[in-house]
């Protein structure tokens, strides 16, 4: 069985280096191209997909749709879960990461971005950016709406989905694609690979590059990004540097 994890293509706020979280921004032209390339990579590898799951945010949904059209997967069969949404960045949402580093320091921004259990400053329930003010999130129980999450919080939010999902795909066998976000995918990797709190802080997932994980009897027996190692390291370094002063 193969599990393919794919971070959405470049979004408008990836391009402008802003904390995005639950803000529902669109893909850039490059992001669309990245999604197309990802779909073609799956074709080249002859990986047929049995299920596709994604979040309820447009940048992930549209990436999933682009990929599905390329690999001839029925778009109407794409399943969505809010639990796969990006980490909610609280009051940081909309702020430029480099400018935020100038104000609070690179160390603090790194803690907000990459620590396991330290959340960003939370937004107030009366804040206009609170998720309860957006129609897209109306079906989510208000008690579950985040106001600012650490990666630990994302894992707690994700686990009800994950426990059902891993059971489903194990029973089905075959190959399965999750199109989601940097931190929801990092949460999955922490659970799946049993990474320590420290190990997960150095995991950087580039946009639009499929990560193929081969699983046998609930054990990982192989994994690879569908990109050459040199290009992968360049992209991962770019992500690591996003919170630095420029």
Where are these regions (language model features)?
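Short, hydrophobic/glycine-enriched beta-strand segments
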Residues: 2-8
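Active-site-adjacent alpha-helix immediately C-terminal to a catalytic or transition-state-stabilizing loop
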Residues: 3, 61, 69, 75, ...
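Active-site glycine-centered loops adjacent to acidic/histidine catalytic or metal-binding residues
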Residues: 8, 83, 181
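Short catalytic helix/loop segments, enriched in acidic residues and glycine
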Residues: 21-38
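Glycine-rich N-terminal loop/short-helix segment of MobA-like nucleotidyltransferase
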Residues: 10-25
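Acidic, His/Gly-rich catalytic cores of divalent-metal-dependent hydrolytic chemistry
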Residues: 227-246
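Phosphate-coordination/substrate-recognition cap region in phosphate-metabolizing enzymes
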Residues: 39-130, 139, 190-214, 239-245
